[in-house]
Every structure is written in structure tokens, then in C-alpha cells.
């Protein structure tokens, strides 16, 4: 279940708490992995908010054949019902319902929950309440002490025979009963037997901002984190032919000749496109835009680089830096550097301090020295979710 807004955790540029990073990985990605790694689990329905599809793709770029996305409703109870309905065609024997913000669910607990499931009862992992409980009066003064004997704090995943728990949710929906605080309460209402088993102290729910901070600190202490930072390089060269301007980084620069190419021959953008694609192992510019395809004849090269940037972002990548070195005797790049930098900022959606454009000559050596063309070398640095695997 990952359709909530997580308002108690406060606002974050990363989105609701299920998409915040702990140990360089989104909370939801870590939670989901516990289930995709479990051989006892079949289809997994991930229920998300209707506005969160882009956040989900960034948090969980990997494709899992047994994972389906379900759009949730206005409440957790309604989102759960919709998630259960999404599995109706498969009609599994059992179902586990888990909070997406409990990322420390372990394989041992999952296996014990499943082992205790029967057609006649559900399973609720829970921990005995260790603290003394007090009931307060309206004025905040202690009214009475409550015996903690037989009291447990419920956790998830809560597991049930599929058909009975779906039926219970449908009945609650039919009469607009929305006051259940968890799925075990709905099961209790419909007299579905639920067995309590020992939960796990590690299986905490991340509710407040401090919970997320502590989870991040815990993961970083558990092991050295190697962020998934990737670097790609690109190189391109185009010869001159008769003309009156060259296009570099999307900017037209007056010149005594133009660059020869199938598209607009923007040597800088071509090199940078290859550099971005390299960070995904996604081939080169010719793979995506073959020169044999007439539709790219004379095309603006910003189409190519924006396509490469889209591939990066769909995998959750954030472009940290791009660097372009132009090698030419002419034209002079300096007077146009600011415009070229701004053009790259607009194409890639990054700040100017993350863009470097440099120029050098070839000291009159080789084809560049003979003013026969321009070469470009580009480097892109991209940060992807997660970390480098061991």
C-alpha cells in the first residue's frame, strides 16, 4: 500500500515519504524488493496515488514481471479494496497486505506469516505492548491505568484467505463503512479468524520525518554506500561544406562554412547525446536515429539530446554535470558560450553551473588544424537511484 500522502512526515522535494531516500534508495523500492525476492510470493499489486506514476517510475526503474500498478482511492481502506480487486482474475488462495513505508520487513517474518496461513484463519504479526498504558481525561490528567496483558501493537503484512477478505472489504464499501484502522479490524468485523504471531522489532513503520532520518542513518551505518554515479563519454566529428553558419549546442553561429551531416550536424549535441546514452548502456545516437532513416534529414539535434535525457530520467537518473569540449580553429566559441550554455540548460533542465563548454584548437595539426571540420568530446555524469551492487 503506497497511495498515501504521508503528511505527518512533512514536505519533501522527493515527494511523499514512500519515495524519500534511505540509504540512497527510495523507501518503496526497498519495501518492494523484500517481496520480489521472496520465492513464496506470486503477483504483487502496488497501489499508488493517481498523481505518483512518475515518482514510482523514478523510485522503481526496474521492471518486474510479477508486479502490477494499481491506482488507489481517497483512503487507505479504499486503496486496499482496489488492490484486492486488481487480483480478482487471478483469484489467489491467500493475500498479504503490507504498508509501503515498512521497508525493513524481513524474509524470516514473511515466511512465518505464510506458514501460519490456513483457509480458516488470517495472520497478524504483532508485538506485545511493553510500556505501561494510561488513559487521559479531557483535561490531560491521568484517568486510569490500562492493563497491558493481552495487548499487542499490530504490524503488516497482514495475511488472509483472499476471497473472505475481499468480500469483507466489499461489504464495508457497500454500506460506506470507512472507520476501520487496519485490515485485521475488517476481518474481525466479518468474523474472520486472525492468528497473532510474533512480529519483528525491525519492521517499523516510517511515520514521521525523524523516522526517515533514523532509517537512512541505520542503512548507512550497516554498510558502506556506493552511490550509483555513472559517467559517459561521447565523441563526434563533422566536416565543413559550403554555407554561412554552424550550429553548436543548438545555437546558430555565423561562419564561412557549415557542417556537413544528415541532420543539422550539431557536433556538440551529437557527442553529448552519446555521453548520456552511455550512462544507461543504451547504444549510441545511430542506434536511435539511424542516418539511413530519411525522417532525420536536416533534423534539429535537440531532438536527439532530449530523447537521451528522457531515457536517463525514465530510469530515475539525475543529470549532475555535462562537459563539452569543442576542437576547432574557427569559429571562435567564446562570444557564444553563454548562449550555448543556456541552450543546454533548457534542453536538459539543469542549472548553468552544471554545464561546462570549452574550446581548444588543434594547433593547426590534422584535419581540424587544416580547418576541414570540427570535433567534439563530451562527458556526462548522472546519478541513478540505489547504489553500485557488490
UniProtKB/Swiss-Prot annotation:
Keyword annotations from UniProtKB, A to Z: Isoprene biosynthesis, Lyase, Metal-binding, Multifunctional enzyme, Nucleotidyltransferase, Transferase
Annotated region described as 2-C-methyl-D-erythritol 2,4-cyclodiphosphate synthase, given as residue ranges: 230-390
Keyword Lyase: yes
Residues carrying the site annotation Positions MEP for the nucleophilic attack: 148, 205
GO terms, biological process: isopentenyl diphosphate biosynthetic process, methylerythritol 4-phosphate pathway; terpenoid biosynthetic process
EC number: 2.7.7.60, 4.6.1.12
GO molecular function: 2-C-methyl-D-erythritol 2,4-cyclodiphosphate synthase activity; 2-C-methyl-D-erythritol 4-phosphate cytidylyltransferase activity; metal ion binding
Cofactor: a divalent metal cation
Record flagged with keyword Lyase: yes
Positions marked as site (Transition state stabilizer): 8, 17, 262, 361
Family of the protein in this entry: In the N-terminal section; belongs to the IspD/TarI cytidylyltransferase family. IspD subfamily.
Full protein name: Bifunctional enzyme IspD/IspF
The species this protein was found in: Brucella suis biovar 1 (strain 1330)
